[in-house]
Amino acid sequence: MRVQMTCEDPIDKFSYWFEEAKKSEPELPEAMSVSTVSADGQPSSRMVLMKAYDKKGFVFYTNLESRKGTEIHSTPRAALLFYWKSLKRQVRIEGQLFPVSDEEADIYFKSRPRGSQIGAWASDQSRPMNNESDLEQSVAKHTEKFAGSTIKRPPFWSGLRLKPQALEFWQDRCFRLHLREVYRLEGKKWKKTLLYP
């Protein structure tokens, strides 16, 4: 199968693929793997949800004191990976991470369900806990604390924008003769290269 659609700008191509994924994936086409690395070079990955994207980059939100938050603080680079099984496609993105503005983070936090807002305060993300009741008690405590009031965004919870420097588009084809297109940012322009599968 040949992919006919070509783009000079990889963000345009991502947008086209993502819109197709939203129609064909049964749930969460915005799910992506985020891979980071610790100060001593230990890699780690986890699934998160992309909350926005544009020409400036790809945005997700997290507890900045979590493992990924501390790794990003020490090494502000990451790799994202989208895989859409229904389309037999994946997109791999590499780049540098930058914090979103407080205003942008506040707007998104305000849009979250109240339970998720409480959860952001209640969970000491990535830290050990004795048992599940510790989390339940923390949720109950913060539910009571914020009863009848607007919940503000925690200072340790915000968004990160990955500014892409490379994107690889992978399309499954017969006999493992897959199509691989890599876009790399050179100066202010994108250069596209085809790779052997």
PLM-predicted stretches and their roles:
Residues 1-197:
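Binding-site signature for planar aromatic cofactors or substrates
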